[in-house]
């Protein structure tokens, strides 16, 4: 192995002195120069398709098959389904193979704009699509790809300049069938509503509208970006997007992990204290191997409720107001000069809390911007639909406690599942639904979050002012 370089302060703080002395370093802080011989740590738990679930895809009784794909910045979800009756014959999820090129859209686009970078990223996704298509044992007859505007432009080999830097705009708007090559069927890409409101939103909104929801409602898909649509009436929509980074996907936090076996997706208070709830339900046992984004939010909400965290995100210096809070407070220590909470064997550092505050501020900004642009009171909302893998696991009460959403919305929040994937599947089994999606660009106004309605009374930075664990209108 190559000799380790001198440790950085951040590596000592995060890894501990023993690990640093043993030669471990953080790859995310070390630019590769070539020629190094390295030992890689065991990869954290990442979701992948269950081979047992794939077997039915080879059932000839399913008839012609379609492949629906939701390509996110961090994750990739897919479904093979019968075009005859719409039934699912296989499905799964995993990581976007481009993740090594950057955990959020900006760095991904920057890599794609380097010589050969875009072609490499495109090839990585096409390799996955080819493998998924092969699971059927025969070529799928149809393919639909949904995802944010950047992911769609990269995989479809479209111009990226208007997505990567100002002035932002769309040079390609989707809503058409694209030839991907590699023996894949032509892919239908739903329309892009804006440079930061993509085909995943148009697909998800179409799937939700097909269920005849009551208006007005809010559709929120929180992942690497916060993509929100405020539906005022049929055919009248406001949309906004805010970059969140990969923290809610479990990426970039000290003990973060994508939801999967052995990963804590929730926490609960028991007579014995704080207990993690692992992915997979009550039958999943053992110490957590990491914490997913929803688990981090629930943990922070509990600590906030018990007075262990202050509203500004700092670990409280004053004694917590309840005996339980003081018991939890006793688990706060210092490591590498930073406050850290021991969460059932996992750690919540002060710097992790800061990352959650940044995510909260961006989400709060999008919510306030939409409601302000519509002149709509929170009480007027009929429902909030939480979409995506994150929405399937997150506690609406935690979102309200931490100020992501205004008070009173938790009781009107509903888990909607992966609506982007549902919409992609709908476009395959009911092609007439594509017309509904293709009308959305003309029915949707994009709300810029730097507009005056996104600010706060008295001026100040609208993002910084929302870096508190309470909702700021």
Give the positions of each predicted feature.
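Acidic, glycine/GT-rich loop-and beta-edge segments that sit at the periphery of enzyme/chaperone cores
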Residues: 24, 39, 43-50, 188-202, ...
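Glycine-rich phosphate-binding loop of actin/hexokinase-like ATP-binding domains
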Residues: 78, 86-104, 161-177, 203, ...
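Catalytic phosphate/nucleotide-handling subdomain of diverse soluble enzymes
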Residues: 368, 372, 376-441
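Fe-S ferredoxin-like electron-transfer domains
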Residues: 5-69, 76
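A contiguous, well-structured pocket-lining segment that forms one wall/lid of small-molecule binding clefts
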Residues: 304-374
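Conserved phosphate-binding catalytic cores of ATP/NTP-utilizing and phosphoryl-transfer enzymes
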Residues: 48-64, 184-217, 371
């Amino acid at each position: 192995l190559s000799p380790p370089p001198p440790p950085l302060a951040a590596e000592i703080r995060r890894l501990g002195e023993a690990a640093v002395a043993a030669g471990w370093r953080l790859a995310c802080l070390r630019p590769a120069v070539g020629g190094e011989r390295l030992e890689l740590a065991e990869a954290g738990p990442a979701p992948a398709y269950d081979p047992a679930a794939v077997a039915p895809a080879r059932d000839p009784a399913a008839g012609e098959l379609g492949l629906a794909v939701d390509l996110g910045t961090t994750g990739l979800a897919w479904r093979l389904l019968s075009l005859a009756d719409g039934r699912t014959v296989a499905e799964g999820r995993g990581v976007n193979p481009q993740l090594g090129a950057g955990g959020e859209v900006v760095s991904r686009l920057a890599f794609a704009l380097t010589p050969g970078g875009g072609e490499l990223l495109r090839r990585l996704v096409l390799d996955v699509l080819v493998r998924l298509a092969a699971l059927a044992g025969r070529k799928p007859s149809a393919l639909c790809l949904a995802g944010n505007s950047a992911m769609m432009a990269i995989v479809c080999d479209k111009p990226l300049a208007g997505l990567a830097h100002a002035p932002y705009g769309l040079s390609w708007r989707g809503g058409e069938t694209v030839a991907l090559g590699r023996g894949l069927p032509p892919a239908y890409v739903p329309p892009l509503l804006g440079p930061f409101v993509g085909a995943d939103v148009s697909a998800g909104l179409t799937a939700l509208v097909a269920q005849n929801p009551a208006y007005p409602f809010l559709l929120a898909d929180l992942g690497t970006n916060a993509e929100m649509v405020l539906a005022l009436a049929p055919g009248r929509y406001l949309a906004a997007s805010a970059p969140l980074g990969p923290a809610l996907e479990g990426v970039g936090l000290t003990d973060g992990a994508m939801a999967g076996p052995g990963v804590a997706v929730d926490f609960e208070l028991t007579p014995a204290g704080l207990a993690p709830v692992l992915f997979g339900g009550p039958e999943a046992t053992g110490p957590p191997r990491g914490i997913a984004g929803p688990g981090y939010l629930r943990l922070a909400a509990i600590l906030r409720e018990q007075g262990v965290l202050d509203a500004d995100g700092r670990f409280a210096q004053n004694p917590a107001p309840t005996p339980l809070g003081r018991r939890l407070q006793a688990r706060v220590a210092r490591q590498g000069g930073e406050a850290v909470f021991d969460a059932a064997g996992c750690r919540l550092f002060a710097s992790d809390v800061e990352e959650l505050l940044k995510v909260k501020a961006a989400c709060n900004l999008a919510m306030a911007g939409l409601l302000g642009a519509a002149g709509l009171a929170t009480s007027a909302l009929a429902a909030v639909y939480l979409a995506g893998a994150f929405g399937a696991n997150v506690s609406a009460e935690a979102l309200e406690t931490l100020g992501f959403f205004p008070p009173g919305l938790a009781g009107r929040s509903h888990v909607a599942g992966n609506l982007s994937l549902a919409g992609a599947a709908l476009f395959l089994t009911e092609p007439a639904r594509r017309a509904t999606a293709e009308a959305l660009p003309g029915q949707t106004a994009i709300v810029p979050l730097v507009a005056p309605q996104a600010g706060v009374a008295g001026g100040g930075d609208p993002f910084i002012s929302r870096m508190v664990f309470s909702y700021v209108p």
